[in-house]
From Swiss-Prot:
The keyword Nucleus applies. It is found in: Nucleus. Its main location: nucleus. Residues 101-120 have a biased composition (Basic residues). One of its GO terms (cellular component) is nucleus. One of its GO terms (molecular function) is histone H3K27me3 reader activity. Residues 88-98 have a biased composition (Basic and acidic residues). PANTHER family: CHROMODOMAIN Y-LIKE PROTEIN 2, PTHR43684. Residues 130-140 have a biased composition (Polar residues). This is Chromodomain Y-like protein 2.
């Protein structure tokens, strides 16, 4: 039948209890024969109390049903909320001349929820019947409006349709662990969209007022999955709008830590521009003041970070050299300073190449995990630039003067294993399991005390903070002078122009 059609009830023929202990009534539709009778759940019989009273002999107590206002002599309507295909489970074939009710444009009647007398008979007649799948609210008080566009793609919707289409097969158990019930209750506190999602994933109500949550094992997995999903949605809704407006990075609030992913939409290979660096600084500022215990920095794509966006530099410095050189140098200074002053542990996951400033900031972080595919290069002298990101101080301290000079002056490339053996990288993982290994270790760190993590970093980094800030200032002053001079700018332009022609 079409979901919007209405059909008129003629009378109730019989009633029964299904395998879940819920009452169903056999409805005779006006204008149709006995072969078209259908079993309808009690909560679908809205505004049909008179038919139920007549069938039960008018012996139902008033406290089990809530009388709704109705006009005497008015025809009773039962709304057809059948959003799913009708399955016909017949004990005998239908007569060839009879057509399905769906072929008739008749109107069917709405009926309110009523509870039958417990002592009534519940045997099903041996006749041609058909089971119908419905979409209902968890409370079972009324039929959900058939607006599948809102919830049709959400988690739990498909599962509820599947379970309801097998209504009465006895395979589902109502028992559930306490934490699952709490999870469903908590999820119901979300906004309209999320509460609708939870409602469609729960199913219909049991007679005793509990919830039919299907199989415990299957339901527990679905609940845990939906709980994590809804928890993130609730957090994003509660955040300040300005905190969510990131164009070139992705910020995720995980349990115990904040995850920042470089995902530049305005530059290639996650190259850095002043605008992108400003977004990272904002994300660091937010993570420093929330309940996160640590910060995870990673990237989307095959390249972690390709350093400064040189095409951006050419365009900006060509238009207004003095003004833009000051602005870009200050953006780099503030970007690096944000890493130096961040009090919580910073974990970096290097999934691919890290070049220039993308590699220079790694010593400012606390733990660096790299994929086997990652490699590191800081060709500052080659591209006519001076070192940035405090690499003029941190690289000699970590790698040794000889290797640091080779990287800064000659642009030597370090593999992940070489960087690990030299102390630039903490540990190297196989590419296929890199993300899983990183997340496992980050979650273990997030289970530690926030105070212990922060104080431990303070003990390790406190004596370096003033030194790094001073080095950062000097490096940015040098970059500003270089970009402000015509000689330094022409040298940069000629190099980048040659690289473009080579490509």
């Amino acid at each position: 039948m079409a979901s919007g059609d209405l059909y008129e009830v003629e009378r109730i023929v019989d009633k029964r209890k299904n395998k879940k202990g819920k009452w169903e009534y056999l409805i005779r539709w006006k204008g149709y024969g006995s072969t078209e009778d259908t079993w309808e759940p009690e909560h679908h019989l809205l505004h049909c109390e008179e038919f139920i009273d007549e069938f039960n002999g008018l012996h139902l107590s008033k406290d089990k049903r809530v009388k709704s206002g109705k006009q005497a002599g008015a025809s009773k309507l039962l709304r057809d909320a059948r959003g799913l295909p009708v399955e016909r489970l017949s004990h005998r074939p239908l007569e060839p001349g009879k057509s399905k009710p769906s072929s008739h444009k008749r109107k069917r009647v709405n009926s309110p929820l009523s509870r039958p007398k417990k002592g009534s008979s519940g045997k099903a007649p041996d006749r041609a019947t058909k089971t119908v799948s419905y979409r209902t609210t968890p409370s079972g008080l009324q039929i959900m409006p058939l607006k599948k566009a809102q919830n049709g793609l959400e988690n739990g919707d498909a599962g509820s349709e599947k379970d309801e289409s097998h209504f009465g097969n006895g395979s589902h158990q109502p028992d559930l662990e306490l934490n699952d019930q709490l999870g469903e209750q908590e999820a119901s506190d979300c906004d309209g969209t999320h509460s609708a999602l939870v409602e469609n994933g729960v199913g219909s109500a049991l007679t005793n007022g509990g919830l039919n949550l299907h199989s415990p094992v299957k339901r527990k997995l679905e609940t845990e999955k939906d709980y994590v999903f809804d928890k993130r949605l609730r957090y994003s809704v509660r955040q300040n709008e300005s905190n969510c407006r990131f164009r070139d990075i992705v910020v995720r609030k995980e349990e115990g830590f904040t995850h920042i992913l470089l995902s530049s939409q305005t530059s290639d290979n996650n190259a850095l521009t002043p605008e992108i660096m400003k977004e990272v600084r904002r994300a660091l500022c937010n993570a420093a003041t929330d309940d996160s215990k640590l910060l995870l920095l990673s990237a989307v794509g095959s390249v972690f970070c390709s350093g400064l966006d040189y095409s951006y530099l050419i365009g900006r410095l060509s238009s207004d050299r003095r003004k833009e050189s000051t602005r870009i140098a200050e953006a780099i200074r503030d970007f690096v300073k944000a890493f130096i002053q961040f009090k919580k542990p910073i974990v970096v996951a290097i999934n691919g190449p890290a070049l220039g400033l993308g590699a220079s900031i790694l010593p400012l972080c606390d733990i660096v995990w790299a994929s086997e595919k990652a490699w590191f290069q800081t060709p500052y002298a080659t591209i006519r630039l001076t070192p940035a990101g405090c690499s003029s101080y941190t690289f000699p301290q970590i790698l040794g003067v000889a290797l640091a000079n080779e990287m800064l002056f000659c642009g030597r490339k370090l593999t992940a294993q070489e960087a690990c053996s030299r102390g630039l990288v903490s540990q190297v993982f196989w590419p296929t399991t890199f993300s899983q290994e990183v997340m496992l270790r980050v979650k273990e760190m997030a289970s530690c005390s926030a105070v212990v993590l922060e104080e431990s970093k303070c003990l390790v980094r406190s004596f370096l903070k003033s030194v790094l800030e001073e080095v950062n200032e000097k490096e940015c002053v040098m970059l500003k002078q270089l970009w402000s001079s015509s000689k330094g700018l022409d040298s940069l332009f000629s190099y980048l122009q040659d690289k473009i022609y080579e490509v």
